[in-house]
UniProtKB/Swiss-Prot annotation:
InterPro entries recorded: FAD-bd, FAD-dep_Monooxygenase_BioMet, FAD/NAD-bd_sf
Protein name: FAD-dependent monooxygenase opaC
GO aspect biological process, one term: biosynthetic process
Known function: FAD-dependent monooxygenase; part of the gene cluster that mediates the biosynthesis of oxepinamides, derivatives of anthranilyl-containing tripeptides that share an oxepin ring and a fused pyrimidinone moiety. The nonribosomal peptide synthetase (NRPS) opaA assembles the quinazolinone core with D-Phe incorporation. The first adenylation domain (A1) of opaA loads and activates anthranilic acid whereas the second A domain (A2) is for activating of L-Phe, which is then converted to D-form by the E domain.
Glycosylation sites: N10, N60
Similarity-based family: Belongs to the paxM FAD-dependent monooxygenase family.
Active-site residues per Swiss-Prot or TrEMBL entry: R193
Keyword Phosphoprotein: no
GO molecular function annotations of the record: FAD binding; monooxygenase activity
Protein encoded by which gene: opaC
Compartments where located: Membrane
Protein keywords: FAD, Flavoprotein, Glycoprotein, Membrane, Monooxygenase, Oxidoreductase, Transmembrane, Transmembrane helix
Length: 462
């Protein structure tokens, strides 16, 4: 199999407008540019500050990013965060070891890296390539017709061939493409997220159980409580430490909206107070205390029913990433699946051509929808099963709410797949015959198809 070669800028005559310049949006912008499309990108933030904690990036996502930059800068940066931890040891609230979660693919390109740092290097790469990216612009109005798509900013029309919404679960693009499930809902779960500089942990002997001067091998430790799962991990050979604390039965009481939680830090004691009765609190507290004040946040975890389409009826608006399929952090696939969407989109648009934008967008959806839906829903299922289980059963392989590394997910090359499958998808769309993707095993495809078919039965859980 061969990965399609990039053909250089401005060869296709297609102008792609991208709304949202996070990981998915920036990957789409660079991929589209390299496939020959003209790109105009917008983000409401005035500066793409390095907010956020860490994210797992598996090879199905990282290889796409490595190939976006011919200077090797992205690949070199990802390599500095290569993950060499082999397992995550899990303890109960008494500090008793109850199981461990294997991390088997650390030698195949698995990385644990800072989310904000990844956004920064992608943005720098896009600017070096000369992409037209406009920050501090909130898009409130957009239109499409059979000939073009436009965004309207202070009365000024910016015209393109299509609009791609990559602006998260609360995207306005959802209502432009789907007749159902356009509003995400609070899942009943939230996650505390934080980041600490590795040097701060090394200076404190109370943190040496997680990271010391000899910490070239990364560590990951989980603590399983009745209503919260806390995971602390180091990465980059001790460059940084990350925290996630997934909690249920949590009433949203904060003033920050679901749209700005990434940039609204909270008091770390809020999380610590919730686990103050744990016997292992004195082990956890020193590490949490080292988390940067402006990098410790509380994220409501949103769910959304399956959209009946990722593409508008006219065929010039599409959603990708969390705008199409919001993920839980326990999936370890949110970033990688957004990257797969983005890279696939760039290729299918190039293969469809300027005169058939709708085909390009619908082909992307056909290739991606079942795969992304299954990975998303399976992570929700594992999360719910864990939190719904008796505490005494959270041992061994069930000690953590994690799905693990699955080969058919992590070893997939979405670019080769998009290139090889396009003709078959095009024929399916032309004839109306169902397209059965091969980037997902048959049993998982059947489950995803059932979820998609029953999308109108999904109700918000209160």
């Amino acid at each position: 199999m061969t990965v399609p070669q990039y053909i250089g800028p401005n060869r296709t005559g297609i102008t792609v407008i991208i709304i949202g310049l996070g990981i998915g949006g920036l990957t789409a912008a660079i991929s589209c540019h390299l496939q020959g499309h003209h790109v105009i990108g917008f983000d409401k933030l005035e500066n793409l500050e390095p907010y956020g904690d860490g994210l797992i990036l598996t090879p199905n996502g990282s290889q796409v990013l490595r190939d976006l930059d011919d200077t090797g800068a992205i690949a070199a940066w990802i390599n500095t965060w290569a993950y060499n931890c082999r397992d995550c040891k899990i303890y109960n609230t008494d500090g008793v070891h109850v199981g461990q979660h294997p991390i088997p693919d650390t030698d195949k390109g698995l990385s644990l890296l800072p989310r904000g740092g990844l956004v920064q290097i992608l943005y720098q790469t896009a600017k070096r390539l000369g992409l037209d990216l406009r920050l501090g612009v909130k898009i409130n109005e957009f239109v499409e017709d059979v000939d073009q798509a436009r965004v309207i900013i202070d009365g000024v029309h910016v015209q393109g061939d299509c609009i791609i919404f990559a602006d998260g679960a609360n995207s306005r693009g959802r209502e432009a493409v789907s007749s159902c499930n356009v509003k995400p809902y609070y899942s009943g779960f939230s996650v505390y997220r934080g980041r600490a500089d590795g040097a701060a942990l090394i200076k404190d002997p109370q943190c040496h159980w997680l990271l010391s001067k000899e910490g070239a091998i990364d560590q990951a430790t989980g603590f399983a409580g009745p209503e919260m799962y806390v995971q602390l991990a180091t990465c980059g050979g001790g460059q940084a430490s990350f925290c996630i604390g997934i909690t249920q039965r949590f009433a949203l009481q904060h003033t920050q909206s679901a749209e700005n939680f990434w940039t609204t830090p909270i008091d770390k004691n809020e999380m610590l107070d919730k686990i103050s009765y744990w016997k292992c609190i004195n082990q956890i507290r020193p590490v949490i205390d080292k988390m940067a004040k402006d990098q410790f946040i509380l994220c409501p975890l949103l769910r959304a029913g399956v959209l009946d389409s990722w593409v508008s009826p006219i065929g010039r608006i599409a959603v990708i990433g969390d705008a199409a399929h919001p993920f839980f952090p326990t999936s370890a696939q949110g970033a990688a699946q957004a990257i797969e969407d983005a890279a696939t989109l760039a290729i299918t648009l190039a293969l469809a051509g300027k005169n058939n934008i709708r085909l390009g967008l619908k082909a992307m959806e056909a290739m991606r929808k079942h795969r992304a839906t299954y990975i998303q829903r399976n992570a929700w299922r594992v999360n719910d099963a864990w939190f719904g289980s008796p505490v005494e059963e959270r041992i061994g392989e069930k000690a953590a709410p994690a799905i693990g590394v699955i080969d058919w997910i992590t070893e997939h090359c979405c670019r080769t797949y998009a290139s090889n499958e396009f003709d078959r998808v095009q024929d399916s769309i032309a004839t109306g015959q169902p397209y059965v993707p091969t980037n997902i095993p048959s049993q998982q495809f059947k489950e995803a198809a059932e979820w998609i078919a029953n999308r109108n039965d999904e109700k918000e859980k209160n």
